[in-house]
């Protein structure tokens, strides 16, 4: 809790600070690929939320969900109660994640959860493959229809489809159009 207490104290009252308290809570056991359960994530999240709320009463706090922040339906069935300005994150990659994941989002919304897509991309979940334009457009339309904010991954210069910059781009900018991936 030391980190979140420090950050909440440092940024208290700064209206554009958003706390995402656990990015992609997945695989507590990487060898056997055993995911954290929603109950485990919820217990941790409630502790962190209480620490932040003790200092910062109104900031938006975003809670991750199992399976790389895809199982928002788990949170919808047992949401965190007693706090305002909570959101749950949903991550997708358009080449891999299709209508079935939007249906999980629809279910969470129908149960009253606020969603924020804090990571997404137009390619496959591994960051590679071609941009799936049709699926990306379907996701953007769905997010717009549901007033969901989103952030595409990633502003980096790695040699992968999801990187917006070419490996030759200066790491600290400024960037020209010739530094951007086509």
Task: Locate each region found by the language model.
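Extracellular glycoside hydrolase catalytic/binding regions
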Residues: 2-18, 22-149, 153-157, 162-182
